[in-house]
A protein has these predicted regions:
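Bacterial N-terminal signal peptides
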Residues: 8-17
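Short, aromatic- and glycine-rich surface loops/edge beta-strands on solvent-exposed regions
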Residues: 538-548
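Short glycine- and acidic-rich boundary segments immediately preceding or forming the N-terminal edge
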Residues: 23-61, 430, 434
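Edge beta-strands of extracellular beta-sandwich domains
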Residues: 551-561
Length: 562
């Protein structure tokens, strides 16, 4: 009877932590910062042998940034999952949270986590995400650190305003002589830039919904919020960029991730649930010569801007496996790699890094009615698809343009409309569990792809009195190489180390006591080493092989003829 009550309590706790989202409100099934913390704590308490939850950083808004460790040992090869860096993309955090839940209760979880570790950061930007749950819902990007975006010596003084009273922030359009936008001929609710080469003249200005609260002629240019964590990492950082922060890692949230990766050499691969993608469309590496043909990554060649060609095959194959596993063959274009965590993990930290956009509107049914066929060269093909998908599947996801009584700009009537806040990035809560299954399956597959340095095959040959040749063949039984080519260049993470330890009275006649291997190819790739030792018969030496992210082994070798 006690067991029945215990199971019932667990079921009730799970229902409270993960509501179904069946009521139909946009926030149903999603967790604000407080409920996210509670859900993680409940999972950790129920699975204390497998799950540890720690606070990685605290945001300016005093909200925790958690890191979840799945698996009992830090020294095992690991995958790091990063989510929630872009505030409006709540779906990434929800998938990461449910991934924690699903990984610990999956069949074979204990066995997988005995040999591997998975780190998950569910929500890197908790401050920005909170506007999803507010009375006024708007896509905030920056954390709670105040910042003077428009450099007028005042912080956060021009926030969005809900002009039509619907509780969400969309866009404003207003006719203007200097307008750059026109209504689309096929779908008039959509706006596109006028093409002067086709004789088109702009009619409208497009602005974020709101008033000019600080009377400087700009609208919502200094909204509440400081640093966009998804733009505060070191690769391709833009100084003075929108919400990018004062300098790379100026935000506690991003700096904590950098410190975590730097101190965890066991992280072999990174999976980013965010706005950048290299799985639907793999990164295209190319040689980009600099001055005098100098390679990237040198003073003359400049910084790395493309994956190294030696890594391309691995990215292509992982992309193929991801698409086969998820059933996704196409998706939205990746966001630019400006200070983002995905490109940073690869270019700066030397890890194989993979990214997914998490969720996006599906393919809309073709509309072949008269006057509804899109042009062959469609400049707004993506927006058109999203609009038609919303009309069929989520009508509230697009707000039709309507005039706002009493709101004029330069004597012209203001209309409000466009895609609803959060609609393009977050599905209904009822879809989150099935969405998580796809991403969890990929993470499980990624763990299986990690490099695996097996205990070496050793042969000992007596070549003379008290003289022995030791030959060791090291094999990588994982799919991925022991280090990415970019990691060999950056020397991050640690390369496979081969160390021969000898004792008193023993002498190393040839071969190096310690050496590093740049990269051992995956899928059974090997590397051979030889030493000649002078030692007493039947004495022993010790061979240490491996790296924190590819596995470590220690072998005692007896020096006798074989």
């Amino acid at each position: 009877m006690t067991q029945v009550r215990s199971l019932g309590a667990v079921a009730l706790l799970a229902a409270l932590a993960f509501p179904s989202g069946a009521q139909g409100r946009p926030t149903d099934g999603y967790h604000n910062a407080a409920r996210l913390s509670a859900a993680l704590d409940s999972i950790a308490r129920a699975n204390s042998s497998l799950v540890r939850v720690e606070v990685l950083a605290t945001s300016p808004g005093r909200r925790p940034v958690h890191v979840v460790r799945l698996g009992g040992r830090e020294e095992r090869p690991a995958v790091l999952v990063l989510a929630g860096a872009y505030g409006p993309q709540l779906s990434s955090s929800e998938v990461a949270l449910r991934m924690v839940r699903d990984l610990v209760r999956a069949n074979g979880a204990a066995a997988m986590l005995q040999d591997n570790t998975i780190y998950i950061v569910p929500r890197l930007n908790p401050d920005a995400s909170e506007t999803f749950f507010g009375a006024l819902r708007w896509e905030r990007k920056g954390n709670d650190g105040a910042f003077d975006d428009d450099r007028d010596m005042a912080d956060d003084e021009d926030a969005p305003n809900d002009l039509n009273g619907d509780g969400i922030i969309t866009m404003m359009r207003v006719k203007a002589v200097n307008g750059e936008w026109i209504a689309d001929a096929v779908d008039p609710a959509l706006m596109r830039r006028a093409d002067a080469t086709k004789g088109e003249r702009g009619v409208y200005r497009l602005l974020s919904e709101g008033r000019d609260d600080d009377n400087d002629g700009e609208y919502n240019e200094d909204a509440p919020g400081g640093t966009d964590i998804s733009r505060n990492f070191g690769n391709n950082f833009r100084f003075f960029g929108e919400n990018s922060g004062l300098h790379p890692f100026s935000a506690d949230e991003s700096r904590a991730v950098a410190e975590f990766v730097s101190t965890h050499d066991n992280i072999a691969a990174v999976y980013v649930l965010g706005m950048q993608d290299n799985l639907i469309k793999a990164w295209e590496g190319r040689r980009v010569p600099g001055i005098g043909g100098s390679p990237q990554g040198t003073s003359a060649g400049g910084p790395f801007t493309a994956t190294l060609p030696e890594d391309n095959g691995w990215f292509n194959e992982v992309s193929r496996r991801f698409k086969a596993s998820t059933g996704w063959s196409e998706g939205p274009a990746t966001a630019s790699d400006v200070g983002d965590p995905l490109s940073w993990a690869y270019f700066h930290m030397g890890r194989f890094a993979f990214g997914s956009r998490v969720w996006w509107p599906g393919k809309a049914a073709a509309d072949t009615a008269a006057g509804r066929r899109a042009p062959a060269q469609d400049a707004i093909a993506s927006e058109r698809n999203d609009y038609r998908w919303m009309k069929a599947n989520n009508p509230a996801g697009f707000v039709e343009w309507t005039p706002v009584q009493g709101m004029m700009i330069d004597g012209e009537q203001v209309e409000v409309g466009g895609f609803a806040a959060f609609a393009l990035l977050n599905p209904a809560g009822s879809q989150l569990d099935s969405l998580t299954m796809k991403h969890t399956a990929f993470v499980t597959d990624l763990v299986k792809m990690l490099p695996r340095i097996a205990a070496p095959t050793v042969t000992v040959t007596e070549v003379g009195p008290r003289v022995y040749r030791v030959r060791a063949v090291i094999q990588n039984n994982g799919f991925l190489p022991s280090n990415a080519a970019i990691g060999v260049r950056s020397r991050l993470p640690q390369r496979v180390r081969v160390e021969m330890l000898i004792g008193n009275g023993q002498q190393l006649s040839s071969g190096r006591r310690m050496q590093y291997v740049n990269a051992i190819p995956g899928s059974g790739g090997t590397e051979a080493f030889e030493w000649v030792l002078v030692a007493a018969p039947n004495s022993t030496v010790t061979l240490n092989v491996g790296s924190p992210h590819a596995g470590l082994s220690t072998q005692t070798i007896t020096l006798r003829a074989r």
